Swiss-Prot record:
Keywords: Lyase, Menaquinone biosynthesis. The keyword Lyase applies. This is 1,4-dihydroxy-2-naphthoyl-CoA synthase. It catalyses: 2-succinylbenzoyl-CoA + H(+) = 1,4-dihydroxy-2-naphthoyl-CoA + H2O. InterPro entries: ClpP/crotonase-like_dom_sf (IPR029045), DHNA-CoA_synthase_MenB (IPR010198), Enoyl-CoA_hyd/isom_CS (IPR018376), Enoyl-CoA_hydra/iso (IPR001753), Enoyl-CoA_hydra_C (IPR014748).
Length: 285
């Protein structure tokens, strides 16, 4: 795709709806080679459940194998949240999040791997809250364009959860060990400027310009060699390839932790809108 002048990069985008069969996401494609996956659960700040993740996996696979698509945007519906992580209301006692048939999943780990291995750039378009598992999802994307109202942070230790895979190791690679420990251990929230200063996002733009600027970045990439982008993504990923094995091990540890009374105390407190009481659990040497 060639854009003869700067103004063309900001031309209005024509989206075609490809959402048929999806319940939790919207899936769209532009006429100039961009796919957009939108988590469409604004009533819960775009928290994901197993169905949400299953549909995102299906949409990303479709975009990967569509040779008309060169770049993929991942975003959340509305301007209040990109994604607030796993929906604690469907988090079960047996190692994951329950689907409608009662089966427990941590399939968001599959989606993380899919983003990493997709040979096309994946761009997070973040407005509002990008928290917990949603924060990890934006980190997994190749680029992050943030609105000036974006809020970032981890909540795991507050809700009896953690991401010891890419959520910890890749974060440390991005922001450094000390800052990653602060983000995880204290569960504070950070505004868009703080995230930019840490290197968590690529740029911050006014909320009103978020999609326009994200599309511009996508169109700039569409002008470049797709094979070069593919090889560069693989090369940059190779620097952290050992983290893929860590993600598998840590995912299993998370599932086991969800089965414990300590893990369930965090979830229950969140759902009951109270402070968790972890004082009854031993701080073993």
């Amino acid at each position: 795709m060639i854009y003869p002048d700067e103004a063309m990069l900001y031309a209005p985008v024509e989206w075609h709806d490809c959402s048929e069969g999806f319940e939790d996401i919207r899936y769209e494609k532009s006429t100039d080679g961009i796919a957009k996956i939108t988590i469409n659960r604004p009533q819960v700040r775009n928290a994901f459940r197993p169905l949400t993740v299953k549909e995102m996996i299906q949409a990303l696979a479709d975009a990967r194998y569509d040779d008309n698509i060169g770049v993929i945007i991942l975003t959340g519906a509305g301007d209040k949240a990109f994604c607030s992580g796993g929906d604690q209301k469907v988090r079960g006692d047996y190692g994951g999040y329950k689907d409608d048939s009662g089966v427990h999943h941590l399939n968001v780990l599959d989606f993380q791997r899919q983003i990493r291995t997709c040979p096309k750039p994946v761009v997070a378009m973040v407005a509002g809250y990008s928290i917990g598992g949603g924060h990890v999802l934006h980190m997994m994307c190749d680029l992050t364009i943030a609105a000036d109202n974006a809020i970032f942070g981890q909540t795991g230790p507050k809700v009896g959860s953690f991401d010891g895979g890419w959520g910890a190791s890749y974060m440390a690679r991005i922001v450094g060990q000390k800052k990653a420990r602060e983000i995880w251990f204290l569960c504070r929230q950070y505004d868009a400027k703080q995230a930019l200063d840490m290197g968590l996002v690529n740029t911050v733009v006014p909320l009103a310009d978020l999609e326009k600027e994200t599309v511009r970045w996508c169109r700039e990439m569409l002008q470049n060699s797709p094979m070069a982008l593919r090889c560069l993504k693989a090369a940059l990923n190779a620097d952290c390839d050992g983290q893929a094995g860590l993600q598998e091990l840590a995912g299993n540890a998370t599932m086991l932790f969800y089965m414990t009374e300590e893990g369930q105390e965090g979830r229950n407190a969140f759902n009951q809108k109270r402070q968790p009481d972890f004082s009854k659990f031993k701080r073993n040497p």
